[in-house]
Structures are given as structure tokens and as C-alpha cells.
Amino acid sequence: MRKLLAATLPALALLAACTPPAATGDAAKPLRTGQVPQQAADAYYVRAAEAVDARIAQRGVKPAKNVILFIGDGMGISTITAARIYAGQKRGLDGESYRLTMETLPYTALSKTYSNDFQVADSASTATAMVTGVKTNSRTLGITSGANFDNCASVEGHRTDSLFDLAERAGLATGVVTTARLTHATPGATYSETPDRDWEAYVGTEENGAEACEDIAAQFIDWPEGDGFEVAFGGGRAAFLKKGTMDPEYDSRESYRRDDRDLVAEWLAKSDQHKYITDQAGFDAENFASDDKVLGLFEYSHMEYDMDRAVDPAGEPSLADLTRAAITRLSQDPDGFVLMVEGGRIDHAHHAGNAARALDEADAFDQAIAAALEMTSADDTLIIVTADHSHTMTISGYPKRGNPILGLASSSLDGTPDKALDGKPYTTLGYMNGPGACRSVDGKLDCTRLDLTNVDTTDKDFVQQSLYPMWSEAHGGEDVAVFASGPGSELVSGVIEENEIFQVMGRASGLVAAPAATE
């Protein structure tokens, strides 16, 4: 036995010397040299960077060639649960046990969505957190909390570098896809810096150093980083057309701009490779496997809800189709890419108290995630799926298994609707606040609860009832889910700050330097 040990121990020692250590902090060599963004001294940035760096020290991080950030605007956890049941029932399957594609990703976390100044945040501050690593003031985009809302003079010295800025400087391809306006809060955070998210087509003030500000659409065209976006898809043509120009699809609708800049013409003038498309036919005709740089503005304002696309006059692609096209184009770059995909209209349907469209939009968003997973590899592409904030929709009552998620709550075997203390049935889905609390009767506001006995609550236009009346339902402030796969996804776990998502993407892709490099 001693002879055997004597012969074996040197071999084991040699094997150990040749085996990579399993110690904490063992990470593969990054693909790129990390950059130090100009907001690196911001307190929110520092705390997030240190938190993610500590996880890297424990777990290591694999390098990601590509990064895709999926944001379901307003897709809180109750929305995910209801969308799961809806998607299953829509396909004739058991809704409760159905799995959305996003739910199959191996790593999960909860994200804290508060902004610098609000417990319940808006989409501008939350998008800024995810793409720049700082929490900022609500209704501001791409600037730190040191700048003031609606005040252009306060912006200087409080600018940021987004992950997309850093990607362009490193020579990567970049893209942004949304079903909202391209200049709306979430997509706008990728390229713009403004003290007011509403300045999409013009600066809405003449005070506080207004001359120092540029509207969001103009910032998209004038974006100084690298060679600009390879693909940018969404709605919002009205912000890009010269003052007085009528929309090509709706001849009674005019441009939002107040100046003579024709931003579409400026885009096309950049190079022969710059293309512009506005409808399904143009989308179908484009070769996304080329080196074209494509701006697609498919609607005057926001794109159609997915369940309404069929009646759109000019036709427009689904979010899944836009995602496939974006990945096809971005994959032409051998150096890798960074892409944001937003399901922007989940949020809009919730604000309207319209759960049917909100859940259908979440299902369409999930199909876009499935498309991305089919086209990419978990070996080199980090995919993160999350929401920017939640909404006040709840799932309540005691509906039995298989009860239509959009229907009246029923716990009985024969399907008889359950009734509240007022003797009226109620839906499984409802809102804390919103337009569904009241209705107009003979020109007056009637806020007594409507008897839903003979109402088709599964109709796509049905507005859920709410507890107290508001013209627009409000955001929710609870934590939202984060799902992740691919290199760097191992850093997504526990309860994290929303701005840590930037650090996860930046460190995994090698675009962002470790905290020690910022000192």
C-alpha cells in the first residue's frame, strides 16, 4: 500500500498542477479591455460595481461575445403568472402548468426598481439604471441624479455612457428594437441624455438653458458613438418628419417636430448602406444578412398591439420577426453585438386597464425571446430578460383550475361565478386603480361597481374593474423578476439592485472595467 501511495502521490501532484484551480474568482480571460464610463464615480454606480465584483470574485464570470437585454415594460410578476396561464389556454393547453420561454432560463433574481427620488419609478429612470448603471431621477434619461428634471443647464457634468456607447467605441454592432416609439423612455435610454423624457420631437421649454438640450429624435440621428446603430426598429415616425410633413400611412396626421430638420433624410444621407423602411412590404424586401444599417419606423406613434396588427393599413412585423431580423443583421459583425428588445406595449395596455392586451403583448414578447434563443448560443451570448417596473394588476378570488384567466372568478364545478358582498360577480384579474372604477352614464361619472353577469370579460376591449378611479392605471413598486442564460448569467441571483444589471452585462462582455480600474 505504501509503495502504491508513493507511486500515486507524485502523479496526483502533477495532475493538480495541470488542473485549473476551482478557487473563487477563477474567470476566463475577457474578450475586450474594459472601459471606465464617465459616471463611474456616481455613488449608485460604485455600489453596484462593488456588489457584482464581489460575486465575480466568488463565482468567476465567463466572457460573452454578445449581449441581448429583453425588457418587458411593466411586466411585473403577476403579469408573468397571468400571461403564462393565458398563453397556455390560448394554445388549448393547461394554463397553470404551462411554461413561458423566459421561465426556462437557468438563472433568476428579483430586481429592486425604485429610482433616486421615487418609491414607484417610471420607465425613463429604470431604463437608465439598466443601461448606465446609475439610479437617477424619474422622468429623466441617460443622466445622473445630480441633474434636475426639465433643466437643461443642470445636465452638464452629469452625463453618462450607456452600454451601447461603450459597445460602439469597442467596435461592436448595436441594435434597439421596441414596439413603442423609438424615442420613448426605454429605447431612448440607449442613446439619449435629456432632463425630460417627453422631449421626443422638440425641447418643451425655453428656460433653464434650453439651448443646451437636443430633442430625443435628433439625438438618435446625431448620436456620436462609433458608426451608430446597425438596426433600430419601432414606432414614432412623427418625431422624425420635418415640421408640416404629413405621415405616409395616415394622411391626416402631421409631424410632431417644430423645426425644419428632416431626420429621415439625414439618416439616409449618412451612407449608401443606410436604409429606411416603414411597413411590412419594406421589411420583407430588406436583406438583413447584408451590411445595411436599417431604421424601421412602422407607425406614426406606437406600433399596433399584436392582436391588432392584422388590421393595420400598411402592415407591420411582429416583435419576434423584428428580433430575428435584428439578430441576423447584428450577427454579420464578427466582433459581437449588443441588442435591446422591448415589449413596450405591455405597459400601455396595463395603463388602460386592458388585461387582455397586456397578457397578449407579454405572450408576443415571450415569442421574441424564443426566437433569440433559437438564433444564438448560450456559449457566447448573454441573454437577460426582465421588466423595468410592475403594475397594480392582481390575481385574486378562488378560481378553480382551468378557469379562463380573463373570465369571471368561479370556484364551483358548474362554472357559476362567485359573487362579492355586493352580490355581483368579479373577474380573476383586477387593478388597484385605473379607468375601470368608473364609467360615463348620460354624461356623468358613475363609480358604482358594474354587474358583470352578462358582460364578456374575455373580450379584447374589456377594461378590468379597479378599486379607485384614475384616468390611467399606475405603476407598481414591487420587485420584478430577472431571468438569464449564457455567459455572465451566473451573476444573476438573489435580490439585486436594478442598476446592477448594467454591471452584469458590462463585466461579462468585457466592455466595463472592474471597480479597481476606476479608482
Show which residues each predicted segment covers.
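Glycine-rich phosphate/pyrophosphate-binding loops
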Residues: 159, 164, 169-189, 515-517
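Bacterial N-terminal signal peptides that target proteins for export
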Residues: 1-8
